[in-house]
UniProtKB/Swiss-Prot annotation:
Keywords linked to the UniProt accession: Lectin
Entry similarity comment: Belongs to the jacalin lectin family.
Signal peptide from the UniProt entry: none
GO molecular function: carbohydrate binding
Known partners and oligomeric status: Formed of four alpha chains and four beta chains.
Residues covered by region (Disordered): 1-20
Function: D-galactose-specific lectin, binds the T-antigen structure Gal-beta1,3-GalNAc.
Source domain of life: Eukaryota
Organism per entry: Maclura pomifera
Name of protein: Agglutinin beta-2 chain
Length: 20
């Protein structure tokens, strides 16, 4: 996705990963 941050929380239809 757009945000290549950290853990395995995938949000949105873009498959963005956010810090858990």
């Amino acid at each position: 996705g757009r945000n290549g941050k950290s853990q395995s929380i995938i949000v949105g239809p873009w498959g963005d990963r956010v810090t858990n």
